[in-house]
């Protein structure tokens, strides 16, 4: 009975609890909903949202990175729980906002130091990536001391990162990728001892990276890609034993690749490309057993193929391109059984084609173009079908036929066998099996076979890029194929193909963006339909015999580059060009255009970056208000008059200004010194006049103001502020060839006097420096400040009236290759310091009043004797050496000392007197005999007249 009662009691109690729970639950449901979000947190979030503009969503941009919900702040409102807002995470107990993810939310605006985000004190995660924030990282963020995760990537933050970022001592993740931060990376970053991820890539940091980076022992990812860090890699990086990703690519790091990188045995990714590394790859790299991707391309590495890399059997990608590697590729590279992508292009590898590469089953990309491989192109046994997607072996020294086994590479989407010396006919049907090709380069095959373009294109259904340059292409508007090609080409290269008419099939290529038909024999007019291709952005018509343009009804606005130089275009510049509203580069140089520069080109003022109209017959003045973002303006060799428009001083992007060989009549444009990027200034052969006042040209590398009427003296400190010519070598690696221009599609060119001859610079190296003041009326002394231009290569001051001594500071011009001070009034000695200038290959001191010992440097011994002529006081062994084959008396007199010269002059005077004395006596005796004997009337009458005057005078007195 007792047990029963106990069981009954338990049941009753249990039912009572259930009843009470249900009642409580119903009360809860009936009660108003409690907000987890704290009011001050909600207010801070709303205030932060209102600090910025919210733009249109950009889902495509964000989807690339897996972000599917842009404009997260659209869900934010005053009457809802902020903890339920998209992108907001709260602490479940306290209601404090601890995570804020506003990535890809279309937020625009500048961060302020008093931003409301500072009130979210307990934030541990802040993700503001993929927006349009501007300004500096302010204390509003740097004081969020609880942060462990901070992502500001892909914005427009700028300025320096303050040392106070070191206050975020709990950070484990810091991503500043793709902003505009500048200055030196603060050493305080290295105080963030818990960091596992640090990405500073795609910014503008410079200088040496802090050596204290080695203290971040937990770091697994370090990316400094695409900045301007310089110097050697900090040795402390060798202490980061947990690193799996190290990317130092696209900086200015120099020296040898340090061996301590081989200590980072956990690395799976190593990027060192696009720096200034020299020497060989360290043997310690053999320790990187976990490495799967290695980039060392675009450096100055040398030596044979680094066999130490053959130990890295896990490599899937190996990029060695654009270095100075030599020797042959080793057959045991096949030990890299996981290799998928192998790039050894643009080196100096020799030997025959390494067909053993085809035995690596995983290999899908082979790039060996731009080496010195030679012999017959043989592929050996190719598995069928091959897995190869890309084969680039062009621009080598291969000879012979195209291997028939190429037809087995059926998965190829890119093939480059350009510059293969086939030495005979080619059966182009061999390519008909490569149905997957998207990109085909068979330019310059040295074949006698003519290509029927329409027939050739019928082989392909997917082809997007075709390069047939340098081959013989048949009449493109006549074909044995009845139907036009069905595929839509995007890029077509037909340069130097002997074409005489516009390829008609282009008319139907509505996907065509790039067209190069330069260096042909195309005559007549450019068809109007060309400008109606909807996405055409590049057209190169240069070096043909075209005479004009058919006027299009309405050109498409897509064109960016129009290159039409060296044709026979006549008449005025066609006005339809003004309708190409996206035009960036216009080159119509070396034609026969006349008239003035069209004022309607003002429609292009916000897009036109390059305008080249040199070598035409243009007249009138330069338009005043048509260009805003010009980078390069070349109107040389025309008939332009008037003055330089002062509006040029507002073109802050201008780098090149060339107005040579016109009729411009103006004073020196000192006001151009306000242009922060001006690098080339050419005023040669105009009617400029007057003094040239002191001006600051911080970026100027080439100045040619020769053959004008400038006069006056040059101020002593004239060259003091020409910093690019004095410090260029400190900021740039001179062996790294970079050219002025717009990259792949256009590069600036000019003609400059160098070493006494006109030299055409088809491309202008950014490290090339020259000063040409010749052919003016300058006087006074050459400024001593000329010696500050330590990177100067060419200096010409000839044909002026400079006087006084040549400054000894010229000996500081250690890079000088050409010096011309001829035809002035210089006195004194040639500075002995010039004898130490080892690069000085050409010099001209002629037609001055120089005297004294000629310097004895080796470069002086290689000069022509004419370089010293008409300087009667020069002497020395160097002069005797270079003039020893000259035997004229004037030449010998030139070498003698002043004392010897004086003695010789006296002797010559006596000899001349003696020579004249003998004939004089003989002539006098003969003349006297005639007078006495014959008394000629013409001689005696004057004496009679005198006698009569005397008699008359006496009679009157």
Swiss-Prot record:
<feature type="glycosylation site" description="N-linked (GlcNAc...) asparagine">
    <location>
        <position position="239"/>
    </location>
</feature>
<feature type="repeat" description="LRR 27">
    <location>
        <begin position="790"/>
        <end position="813"/>
    </location>
</feature>
<feature type="repeat" description="LRR 29">
    <location>
        <begin position="839"/>
        <end position="862"/>
    </location>
</feature>
<feature type="repeat" description="LRR 12">
    <location>
        <begin position="386"/>
        <end position="409"/>
    </location>
</feature>
<feature type="repeat" description="LRR 16">
    <location>
        <begin position="486"/>
        <end position="509"/>
    </location>
</feature>
<feature type="repeat" description="LRR 14">
    <location>
        <begin position="434"/>
        <end position="458"/>
    </location>
</feature>
<feature type="glycosylation site" description="N-linked (GlcNAc...) asparagine">
    <location>
        <position position="381"/>
    </location>
</feature>
<feature type="repeat" description="LRR 7">
    <location>
        <begin position="268"/>
        <end position="287"/>
    </location>
</feature>
<feature type="repeat" description="LRR 13; degenerate">
    <location>
        <begin position="412"/>
        <end position="433"/>
    </location>
</feature>
<keyword id="KW-0472">Membrane</keyword>
<feature type="repeat" description="LRR 1">
    <location>
        <begin position="120"/>
        <end position="143"/>
    </location>
</feature>
<keyword id="KW-0433">Leucine-rich repeat</keyword>
<keyword id="KW-0675">Receptor</keyword>
<keyword id="KW-0732">Signal</keyword>
<keyword id="KW-0677">Repeat</keyword>
<feature type="repeat" description="LRR 11">
    <location>
        <begin position="361"/>
        <end position="384"/>
    </location>
</feature>
<feature type="glycosylation site" description="N-linked (GlcNAc...) asparagine">
    <location>
        <position position="711"/>
    </location>
</feature>
<feature type="repeat" description="LRR 18">
    <location>
        <begin position="535"/>
        <end position="556"/>
    </location>
</feature>
<feature type="glycosylation site" description="N-linked (GlcNAc...) asparagine">
    <location>
        <position position="78"/>
    </location>
</feature>
<dbReference type="GO" id="GO:0005886">
    <property type="term" value="C:plasma membrane"/>
</dbReference>
<feature type="glycosylation site" description="N-linked (GlcNAc...) asparagine">
    <location>
        <position position="812"/>
    </location>
</feature>
<feature type="repeat" description="LRR 19">
    <location>
        <begin position="558"/>
        <end position="580"/>
    </location>
</feature>
<dbReference type="Pfam" id="PF13855">
    <property type="entry name" value="LRR_8"/>
</dbReference>
<feature type="repeat" description="LRR 2">
    <location>
        <begin position="144"/>
        <end position="170"/>
    </location>
</feature>
<keyword id="KW-1003">Cell membrane</keyword>
<feature type="repeat" description="LRR 25">
    <location>
        <begin position="698"/>
        <end position="721"/>
    </location>
</feature>
<feature type="glycosylation site" description="N-linked (GlcNAc...) asparagine">
    <location>
        <position position="311"/>
    </location>
</feature>
<dbReference type="InterPro" id="IPR055414">
    <property type="entry name" value="LRR_R13L4/SHOC2-like"/>
</dbReference>
<dbReference type="InterPro" id="IPR003591">
    <property type="entry name" value="Leu-rich_rpt_typical-subtyp"/>
</dbReference>
<feature type="repeat" description="LRR 24">
    <location>
        <begin position="675"/>
        <end position="697"/>
    </location>
</feature>
<feature type="glycosylation site" description="N-linked (GlcNAc...) asparagine">
    <location>
        <position position="242"/>
    </location>
</feature>
<feature type="repeat" description="LRR 28">
    <location>
        <begin position="814"/>
        <end position="837"/>
    </location>
</feature>
<dbReference type="Pfam" id="PF08263">
    <property type="entry name" value="LRRNT_2"/>
</dbReference>
<feature type="glycosylation site" description="N-linked (GlcNAc...) asparagine">
    <location>
        <position position="167"/>
    </location>
</feature>
<dbReference type="InterPro" id="IPR013210">
    <property type="entry name" value="LRR_N_plant-typ"/>
</dbReference>
<dbReference type="InterPro" id="IPR001611">
    <property type="entry name" value="Leu-rich_rpt"/>
</dbReference>
<feature type="glycosylation site" description="N-linked (GlcNAc...) asparagine">
    <location>
        <position position="446"/>
    </location>
</feature>
<keyword id="KW-0325">Glycoprotein</keyword>
<protein>
    <recommendedName>
        <fullName>Receptor-like protein 53</fullName>
    </recommendedName>
</protein>
<feature type="repeat" description="LRR 22">
    <location>
        <begin position="631"/>
        <end position="651"/>
    </location>
</feature>
<feature type="glycosylation site" description="N-linked (GlcNAc...) asparagine">
    <location>
        <position position="252"/>
    </location>
</feature>
<feature type="glycosylation site" description="N-linked (GlcNAc...) asparagine">
    <location>
        <position position="114"/>
    </location>
</feature>
């Amino acid at each position: 009975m007792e047990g029963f009662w106990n069981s009954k009691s338990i049941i009753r109690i249990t039912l009572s609890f259930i009843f009470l729970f249900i009642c409580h639950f119903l009360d809860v449901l009936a009660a108003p909903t409690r907000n987890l979000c704290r009011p001050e947190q909600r207010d801070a979030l709303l205030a932060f949202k209102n600090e910025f503009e919210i733009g249109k969503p950009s889902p495509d941009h964000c989807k690339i990175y897996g972000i599917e919900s842009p404009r997260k702040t659209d869900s934010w409102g005053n009457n809802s729980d902020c903890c339920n807002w998209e992108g907001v995470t709260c602490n479940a107990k306290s209601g404090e906002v601890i995570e804020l993810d506003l990535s890809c939310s279309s937020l625009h605006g500048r961060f302020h130091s008093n931003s409301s985000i500072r009130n979210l004190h307990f934030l541990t995660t802040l993700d503001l990536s993929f927006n349009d924030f501007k300004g500096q990282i302010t204390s509003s963020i740097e004081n969020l001391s609880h942060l462990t995760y901070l992502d500001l990537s892909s914005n427009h933050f700028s300025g320096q990162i303050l040392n106070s970022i070191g206050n975020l001592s709990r950070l484990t993740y810091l991503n500043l990728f793709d902003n505009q931060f500048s200055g030196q990376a603060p050493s305080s970053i290295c105080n963030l001892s818990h960091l596992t991820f640090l990405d500073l890539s795609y910014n503008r940091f410079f200088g040496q990276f802090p050596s204290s980076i080695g203290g971040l022992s937990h770091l697994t990812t370090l990316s400094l890609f695409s900045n301007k860090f310089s110097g050697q890699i900090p040795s402390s990086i060798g202490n980061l034993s947990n690193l799996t990703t190290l990317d130092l690519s696209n900086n200015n790091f120099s020296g040898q690749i340090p061996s301590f990188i081989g200590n980072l045995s956990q690395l799976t990714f190593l990027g060192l490309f696009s720096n200034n590394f020299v020497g060989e790859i360290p043997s310690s790299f053999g320790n990187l057993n976990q490495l799967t991707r290695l980039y060392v391309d675009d450096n100055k590495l040398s030596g044979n193929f680094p066999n130490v890399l053959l130990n890295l059997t896990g490599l899937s990608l190996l990029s060695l391109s654009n270095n100075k590697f030599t020797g042959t590729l080793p057959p045991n590279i096949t030990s890299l059984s996981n290799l998928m992508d192998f790039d050894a292009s643009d080196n100096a590898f020799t030997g025959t084609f390494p067909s053993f590469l085809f035995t690596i089953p995983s290999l899908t990309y082979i790039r060996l173009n731009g080496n010195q491989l030679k012999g017959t192109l043989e592929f050996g046994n190719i598995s069928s079908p091959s897995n190869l997607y890309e084969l680039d072996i062009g621009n080598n020294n291969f000879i012979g036929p195209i291997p028939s086994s190429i037809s087995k590479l059926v998965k190829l989407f890119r093939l480059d066998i350009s510059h293969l010396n086939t030495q005979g006919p080619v059966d182009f049907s061999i390519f008909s099996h490569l149905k997957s090709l998207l990109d085909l380069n068979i330019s310059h095959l040295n074949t006698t076979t003519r290509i029927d373009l329409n027939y050739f294109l019928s082989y392909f259904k997917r082809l997007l890029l075709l390069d047939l340059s340098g081959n013989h292409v048949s009449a493109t508007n006549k074909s044995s194929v009845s139907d036009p090609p069905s595929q839509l080409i995007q890029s077509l290269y037909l340069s130097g193909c002997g074409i005489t008419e516009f390829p008609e099939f282009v008319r139907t290529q509505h996907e065509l963006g790039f067209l190069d038909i330069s260096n042909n024999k195309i005559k007549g007019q450019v068809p109007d339909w060309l400008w109606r291709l909807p996405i055409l952005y590049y057209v190169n018509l240069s070096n043909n015999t075209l005479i004009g343009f058919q006027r299009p009804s309405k050109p498409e606005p897509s064109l960016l580059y129009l290159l039409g130089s060296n044709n026979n275009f006549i008449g005025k510049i066609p006005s339809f060009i003004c309708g190409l509203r996206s035009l960036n580069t216009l080159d119509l140089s070396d034609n026969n255009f006349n008239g003035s520069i069209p004022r309607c080109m003002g429609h292009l003022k916000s897009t036109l970056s390059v305008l080249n109209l040199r070598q035409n017959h243009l007249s009138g003045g330069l338009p005043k208000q048509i260009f805003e973002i010009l980078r390069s303006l070349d109107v040389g060799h025309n008939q332009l008059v008037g003055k330089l428009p002062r509006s040029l001083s507002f073109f802050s992007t201008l780098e090149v200004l060339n107005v040579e060989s016109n009729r411009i009549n103006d004073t020196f444009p000192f006001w151009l010194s306000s242009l922060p990027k001006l690098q080339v200034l050419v005023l040669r052969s105009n009617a400029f006049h007057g003094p040239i006042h002191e001006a600051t040209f911080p970026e100027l590398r080439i100045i040619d103001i020769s053959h004008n009427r400038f006069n006056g003296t040059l101020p002593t400190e004239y060259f003091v502020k020409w910093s690019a010519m004095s410090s260029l070598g400190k900021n740039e690696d001179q062996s790294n060839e970079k050219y002025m221009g717009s990259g792949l599609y256009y590069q600036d060119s000019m003609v400059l006097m160098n070493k006494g001859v006109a030299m055409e610079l088809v491309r202008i190296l950014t490290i090339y420096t020259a000063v040409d003041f010749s052919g003016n009326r300058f006087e006074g002394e050459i400024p001593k400040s000329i010696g500050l231009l330590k990177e100067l290569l060419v200096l010409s001051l000839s044909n002026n009236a400079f006087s006084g001594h040549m400054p000894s500071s010229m000996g500081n011009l250690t890079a000088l290759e050409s010096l011309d001070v001829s035809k002035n009034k210089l006195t004194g000695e040639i500075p002995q310091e010039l004898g130490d200038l080892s690069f000085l290959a050409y010099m001209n001191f002629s037609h001055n009043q120089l005297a004294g010992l000629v310097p004895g440097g080796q470069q002086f011994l290689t000069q022509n004797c004419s370089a010293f002529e008409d300087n009667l006081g020069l002497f020395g062994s160097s002069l005797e050496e270079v003039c020893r084959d000259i035997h004229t008396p004037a030449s010998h007199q030139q070498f003698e000392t002043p004392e010897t010269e004086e003695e010789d002059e006296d002797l010559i005077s006596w000899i001349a007197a003696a020579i004249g004395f003998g004939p004089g006596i003989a002539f006098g005796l003969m003349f006297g005999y005639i007078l006495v004997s014959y008394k000629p009337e013409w001689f005696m009458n004057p004496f009679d007249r005198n006698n009569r005057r005397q008699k008359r005078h006496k009679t009157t007195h």
